[in-house]
A protein has these predicted regions:
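Extended, charge-rich alpha-helical scaffolding segments
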Residues: 1-119
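Extended cytosolic assembly modules
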Residues: 116-128
Length: 128
């Protein structure tokens, strides 16, 4: 590979790495926002259940009915948010691995190595 094409390839890899890091930051923000939203929904569900119990204790049928309706809605939202949070956590882990791989490839390229080559094996810490 010529020196000029190596520089061009390194530049393209750096640009791709920057885009990946921006995407990683956005994924982390989405994960954190979803986590916060999930906690709010759980708090709301606890409040609704407490109100339903209080309404049951005083025989307020309308409030009991409304509490049951809101319990169902919050429970459904919680289930969706839990799945969403799990998917976002997997996405963040995936993008973190990909970003680390891209960084390693870029370092190998900058060091004059083949970016497609596997990273060098760690030396065996145990002597023979």
């Amino acid at each position: 590979m010529s020196d000029q094409s190596a520089r061009a390839r390194a530049r393209l890899m750096r640009e791709a790495l920057v885009e990946a890091k921006v995407g990683l930051a956005q994924s982390r923000e989405a994960r954190d926002a979803t986590s916060a939203q999930l906690e709010r929904e759980r708090t709301e569900l606890a409040t609704v259940r407490r109100r339903g119990q209080l309404a049951t204790a005083i025989n307020d049928a309308e409030t009991v009915r409304l509490a049951a309706e809101f319990d169902r809605k919050h429970s459904e939202r919680i289930a969706v948010l839990e799945r969403k949070l799990a998917a976002l956590a997997q996405e963040v882990a995936l993008v973190e691995r990909e970003t680390a791989e891209m960084s390693a490839q870029l370092k190998r390229l900058a060091g004059g190595g083949d970016p497609a080559a596997p990273p060098p094996a760690d030396p065996d810490p145990l002597p023979d």
